[in-house]
UniProtKB/Swiss-Prot annotation:
Encoding gene (name): dnaJ
Function: Participates actively in the response to hyperosmotic and heat shock by preventing the aggregation of stress-denatured proteins and by disaggregating proteins, also in an autonomous, DnaK-independent fashion. Unfolded proteins bind initially to DnaJ; upon interaction with the DnaJ-bound protein, DnaK hydrolyzes its bound ATP, resulting in the formation of a stable complex. GrpE releases ADP from DnaK; ATP binding to DnaK triggers the release of the substrate protein, thus completing the reaction cycle.
Origin species: Ruegeria sp. (strain TM1040) (Silicibacter sp.)
Annotated protein name in UniProt: Chaperone protein DnaJ
Positions of the J domain: 5-70
Cofactor note: Binds 2 Zn(2+) ions per monomer.
Length: 385
């Protein structure tokens, strides 16, 4: 039976790059793996075919020969780049073809790395940590230095992070020679498993540290001084490199990320770098106009001139009285929104004065009222017609 085209076998085009060829083989290898095809009697042959195709196409010289001569390149001793394979046969060494994707492939099946992973697992980077920090709006405005206590894992001082009693260096695992994985031949397939002796670490500790039980780190609360810049807002993230969890067995530490939450303020509402403040004013002040004092976020006072006849909702701006920009570039503004307050709990004299005021008011005294009821009258007249 004639052989299928190698590119077709891997599901890639003839112009595929080396990376695309590798991805194609990895996909096929996962599809045809025996753990997933126990009921498919053809899976082994198809897997062998994919391995043979990848063995050729991953090698630039052998790929060039195949592109020029096809399968004939490896018949009758052709295919000069065969390098030690009898007759230049492309499928002679399963392990060599598979080794460069073994880590990724079996990591999916067994939850770990491949045969070279053990060396990396000896020293593992510590996890990144998150710390939520709640600030007042005043603190966010001014910035501050704040001391926080972070529960984390720190390097064990008893063993200097090695996990071994007295700080002794771990020894290489004799079973896997430090690789963290062992290989077993199962018929046609070579399967990698986590080393049972060292549990995939590639190392052994004869006398584990009694303080950290061989982990090289211990749980502890750390006190850190953090610089919070002026202008932070809810969602701002501050990264402290190397202040996260300590690494395993001498590995580098992770990072600490501080997430800022700014509490709501009783007077000010923030919108970007601008602040809004709703200020109640008396009916008389709104009608007659005049100056009022308003609070500012820095603890000071701002002076605002209210025009005569101001209505609720009118806004006035105090420039430069908002929040500082986090990365420089000036300061926001503060917007004053007037809320005209209708008087309550009136004395008899006050009621008398208001009645007199209403009686002597002219049509143009309350233009909005006049305009509204004029529209209402037109509406009713239209309904009658």
């Amino acid at each position: 039976m004639s052989k299928r085209d190698y590119y077709e076998v891997l599901g890639v085009s003839k112009g595929a790059s080396a990376d695309e060829i590798k991805k194609g083989f990895r996909k096929k290898a996962k599809e045809l793996h025996p753990d997933r095809n126990a009921d498919n009697p053809d899976a082994e042959a198809q897997f062998k075919e994919a391995n043979e195709a990848y063995d050729v196409l991953k090698d630039p010289e052998r790929k060039a020969a195949y592109d020029r001569y096809g399968h004939a390149a490896f018949e009758n001793g052709m295919g000069g780049g065969g390098g030690g394979r009898a007759g230049g046969h492309p499928g002679g060494d399963f392990s060599s073809a598979f080794s460069d994707v073994f880590d990724d492939l079996f990591g999916d099946f067994m939850g770990g790395g491949g045969g070279r992973a053990g060396a990396r697992q000896r020293a593992t980077r510590g996890a990144d940590l998150r710390y939520n920090l709640r600030l007042s709006l005043e603190e966010a405005f001014a910035g501050l230095h704040k001391t926080i206590n972070v529960p984390t894992s720190v390097s064990c001082t008893s063993c200097e992070g090695t996990g071994a009693e007295g700080g002794a260096e771990p020894t290489t695992c004799p079973t896997c020679s430090g690789m963290g994985k062992v290989r077993a031949q199962q018929g046609f397939f070579t399967v990698e498993r986590t080393c049972p002796t060292c549990s995939g670490l590639g190392q052994m500790i004869k006398n584990p540290c009694k303080t950290c039980n061989g982990h090289g780190r211990v749980e502890k609360d750390r006190s850190l001084s953090v610089n919070i810049p002026a202008g932070v807002e809810t969602g701002t993230r501050i990264r402290l490199a190397g202040e996260g969890e300590a690494g395993l067995r001498g590995g580098p530490p992770g990072d600490l990320y501080i997430f800022i939450e700014v509490a709501r303020h009783e007077l000010f509402e923030r919108e970007g770098n601008n602040l809004h403040c709703r200020v109640p004013v008396s009916m008389a002040k709104a009608a007659l106009g005049g100056a009022i004092e308003v609070p500012t976020i820095d603890g000071g006072r701002g002076r605002v001139q209210i025009p005569e006849g101001s209505q609720s909702g009118r806004q006035m701006r105090l420039r430069g009285k908002g929040m500082p920009a986090l990365r420089g570039g000036g300061t926001g503004d503060m917007f004053i929104e007037l809320a005209v307050e209708t008087p309550v709990n009136l004395t008899p004299r006050q009621k008398e004065i208001l009645k007199e005021f209403d009686e002597i008011s002219e049509e143009n005294t309350n233009p909005e009222t006049r305009s509204f009821f004029s529209s209402v009258k037109s509406f009713w007249d239209g309904m009658k017609g």
